[in-house]
A protein has these predicted regions:
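Glycine-enriched alpha-helix->loop->beta-strand junction motifs that scaffold or abut catalytic
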Residues: 13, 58, 115-121, 142-148, ...
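Active-site-adjacent beta->alpha loops and helix N-cap segments on the catalytic face
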Residues: 70-85, 102-107, 129-142, 204-213, ...
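Conserved anion-binding
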Residues: 97, 101-198
Length: 288
């Protein structure tokens, strides 16, 4: 069974919410900060409480490495400890690293994030340099069932600068990326009909959502854009197949939920936000 199979089963059991642990130190409640601990240690405590509170309603977690790199060595220890905490909770974890290099460098990235202290179940990758920026990760997919989520059509405003450019045959650049990855993924299919090579598809392109889902029916989607970037449950539902086939990331919306729920502890508020998000998406899916 591949990690993508396990993610599919996690979504079936707990829903498609992907809790983004993009934990900026400024997000922490003032009364949670312990001056006797390092920032990294405090962030790990914060993340652990969030994991404990939300693991019953989270399909997976996504840990964005930049928030930890910015704190230097203590931050990278916090990153490793956070990955370990998620894995010990028995929930799939995505390392949001967006690596995009080739050859030996990519081999080292793959080893660094699929083994050892920074081991994760999935990594995010940027394909701009070509399929040889993806291939060094594939032995881990083949032998260990590891999964990839490759940037395809993203939710940021600047996506139009490259991704939306048209090719001579009328396709967009994101179509070319998706088509090549979809073809590559045929050799890495799992038991539940999804490839180990997933796509990052922003949840803010509702006008083409149904077409994208149908075109890449074998690809599991990592869907950013919910909440803070404008994606709504009724939009997100279009990217799913019977409520599965993708996970929907929310970071700030969950981490900062306590600010919209006065008097509620941050971990309880995060749980409430996950439940609300899960129920909203499930309702939207039921209307399709």
């Amino acid at each position: 069974m591949t990690n993508m199979d396990k993610l599919y089963e996690a979504v079936e059991a707990r829903g498609p919410v992907c809790v983004g642990l993009d934990t900026d130190f400024s997000y922490l409640p003032a009364d949670f900060v312990d001056s006797t601990l390092t920032r990294g240690e405090i962030i790990v405590r914060f993340n652990q409480k969030l994991i404990d509170a939300t693991k019953a309603v989270a399909g997976c977690y996504k840990v964005q490495i930049a928030y930890y790199e910015s704190l230097g060595l203590e931050g990278m220890k916090a990153y490793a400890d956070t990955l370990k905490a998620v894995r010990e909770a028995g929930v799939p974890v995505i390392a949001d690293i967006k690596r995009g290099d080739i050859a030996k460098t990519a081999e080292m990235y793959a080893m660094g994030h699929f083994t050892g202290d920074f081991e994760a179940d999935f990594v995010t990758l940027a394909p701009y340099m070509g399929l040889d920026s993806i291939s060094p990760y594939l032995p881990y997919a083949e032998k260990q069932g590891k999964g990839l989520f490759v940037l395809c059509r993203t939710s940021n405003g600047g996506a139009k600068d490259f991704e939306y450019e048209k090719l001579a045959d009328g396709r967009h650049v994101y179509d070319l990326v998706g088509d090549k990855l979809n073809a590559l993924g045929k050799d890495y299919m799992g038991e539940h009909g999804y490839s180990s090579i997933g796509l990052v598809i922003g949840g803010t392109h509702i006008e083409e959502a149904t077409e994208i889902r149908a075109k890449y029916k074998d690809s599991f989607f990592l869907i950013p854009g919910y909440g803070a970037q404008g994606g709504k449950a009724e939009d997100i539902a279009q990217y799913l197949t019977k409520g599965n086939g993708g996970v929907v990331n929310s970071s700030r919306g969950i981490l900062l939920a306590y600010k919209k729920q006065p008097g509620t502890a941050f971990d309880e508020a995060a749980y409430n936000e996950c439940v609300n998000m899960k129920e909203a998406i499930a309702h939207a899916c039921s209307l399709l």
